[in-house]
């Protein structure tokens, strides 16, 4: 990257974008941890551990269905409609959803069906906002500043994932409706900052093209670009198998016995590692051997998830038990679990950084929305469908067996991808072949 590239925070529109994403991420993370805890607690009133864990998987599936059905369309929308207004509309939906959950909790009438409906609303909002958010960032900064913009944008997301779960767990311990009330306020703040983003360049109009053809072009582009295909599918299968976050309420309540506060810390663990890595990349952008570093990072991610899964039996086998020394509660299994999640988060951030940089820099702006939609579809499949997979496997193997299976599976998948896609290992830098640009990449739109 050129040394003269301006830092993204020097650009007013990007600052507003960053603050909007930061506020929204804290709110989403706080609500996700509270919803997961409430679903598991309500389910445990009438179900055993395996059955309740399956309900956590179903929450992930409820979010995946609208994402799966809508994402191909939302990519086209992101390439056809002002991306700022897409995010404004979806954030309004999130404000309404958080406010409704606050009311139901306050009234004492919150039920599992209501929580599942909230998960569906989350899925709809994310289906539209994901491609719009991703495709908007390159319009706010010069091309040479984009890798740094991706890194600092990831900081907003990762710091939000640190603060959100911790805040959500602590506020839930005070009272559940307090957590939902704060989430509603934070979504409103995110909406205000999105309205502060001024005019930005829009993709060129393509009214002469049939919508179905334009939708399929996004999938065709990904299929033909093997490097982009490799990065997207590696994340899909690795996280699909090793996504253990949906089972954190099970670990917090029935394995580690640390309650909602401990759940908040566990959920923040991956964010801590990811945020530290993103901060490093914002000052020291990766520039060499990017493909090999991504492959190594995903292997480390799988091994870290495996370590998290076996932390409790390993510490028990070593004779390390929970005890209080000098007024400090020492919980070896919890500490090892936290350390493993921090490492997993840092490794995952390396993968995210490489994947997003390659996708954004290897895609012309007129197609970024559709390609970002394809990327989001795979991300949602790996995350939400991965939650469902974790719930199903936990109902069969138990929660520990499900996490161990996922960690081993992610490692094996990465080794296989290194052989199937030699283009990924051969990628030395982010620099793409010459891409035909059809519009300016940054600056203010002319009135």
For the regions a language model picked out, list residue spans one by one:
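Juxtamembrane intracellular "pre-TM" segments in multi-pass secondary transporters
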Residues: 1-15, 200-233, 324-328, 437-446
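Helix-loop boundary and gating motifs at the non-cytosolic
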Residues: 2-65, 220-270
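Structural signature of transmembrane alpha-helices in multi-pass secondary transporters
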Residues: 24, 63, 122, 153-160, ...
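Glycine/proline-centered helix-kink
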Residues: 33, 158-169, 246, 278, ...
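C-terminal transmembrane bundle of multi-pass solute transporters/carriers
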Residues: 57-62, 69, 73, 80, ...
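Helix-loop-helix hairpin linking two adjacent transmembrane segments in secondary transporters
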Residues: 107-114, 157-194
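Cytoplasmic helix-loop-helix junction between adjacent transmembrane helices
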Residues: 118-159
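C-terminal membrane-cytosol helix-exit motif in multi-pass small-molecule transporters
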Residues: 125, 129, 185-203, 416-421
């Amino acid at each position: 990257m050129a040394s003269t590239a301006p830092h993204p925070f020097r650009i007013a529109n990007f600052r507003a974008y960053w603050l909007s994403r930061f506020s929204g991420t804290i709110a989403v993370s706080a609500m996700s941890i509270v919803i997961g805890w409430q679903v598991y607690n309500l389910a445990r009133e009438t179900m055993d551990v395996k059955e309740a864990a399956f309900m956590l998987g179903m929450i992930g599936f409820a979010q995946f269905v609208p994402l799966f059905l809508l994402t191909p369309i939302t990519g086209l929308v992101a390439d056809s409609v002002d991306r700022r207004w897409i995010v404004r509309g979806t954030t309004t939906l999130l404000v309404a959803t958080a406010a409704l959950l606050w009311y139901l909790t306050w009234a004492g009438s919150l039920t599992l069906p209501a929580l599942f409906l909230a998960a569906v609303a989350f899925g709809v909002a994310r289906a539209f906002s994901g491609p719009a958010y991703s495709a908007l960032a390159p319009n706010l900064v010069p091309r040479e500043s984009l890798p740094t913009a991706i890194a600092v944008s990831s900081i907003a997301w990762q710091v939000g994932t640190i603060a959100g779960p911790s805040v959500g767990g602590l506020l839930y311990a005070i009272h559940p409706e307090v957590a939902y009330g704060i989430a509603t306020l934070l979504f409103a703040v995110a909406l205000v900052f999105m309205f502060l983003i001024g005019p930005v360049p829009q993709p060129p109009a393509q009214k002469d093209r049939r919508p179905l053809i334009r939708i399929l072009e996004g999938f065709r582009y990904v299929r033909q670009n093997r490097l982009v295909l490799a990065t997207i599918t590696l994340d899909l299968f690795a996280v699909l198998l090793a996504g253990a976050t949906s089972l954190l309420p099970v670990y917090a309540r029935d394995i580690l016995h640390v309650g909602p506060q401990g759940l908040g810390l566990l959920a923040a663990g991956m964010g801590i590692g990811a945020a530290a890595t993103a901060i490093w990349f914002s000052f020291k952008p990766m520039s060499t051997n990017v493909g090999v570093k991504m492959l190594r990072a995903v292997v480390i991610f799988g091994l870290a998830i495996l370590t998290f899964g076996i932390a409790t039996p390993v510490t028990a086998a070593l004779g390390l038990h929970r005890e209080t020394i000098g007024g400090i509660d020492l919980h070896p299994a919890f500490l090892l679990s936290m350390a493993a999640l921090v490492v997993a988060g840092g490794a995952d951030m390396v993968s995210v950084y490489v994947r997003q940089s390659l996708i954004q820099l290897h895609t012309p702006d007129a197609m970024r929305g559709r390609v970002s939609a394809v990327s989001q579809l795979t991300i949602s499949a790996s995350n939400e469908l991965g939650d469902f997979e974790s719930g199903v496997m936990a109902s069969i193997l138990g929660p520990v067996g499900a996490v161990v299976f996922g960690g081993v599976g992610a490692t094996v998948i990465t080794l296989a991808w290194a052989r199937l896609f030699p283009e990924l290992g051969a990628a030395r830098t982010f620099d793409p072949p010459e891409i035909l640009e059809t519009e300016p990449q940054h600056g203010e739109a002319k009135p």
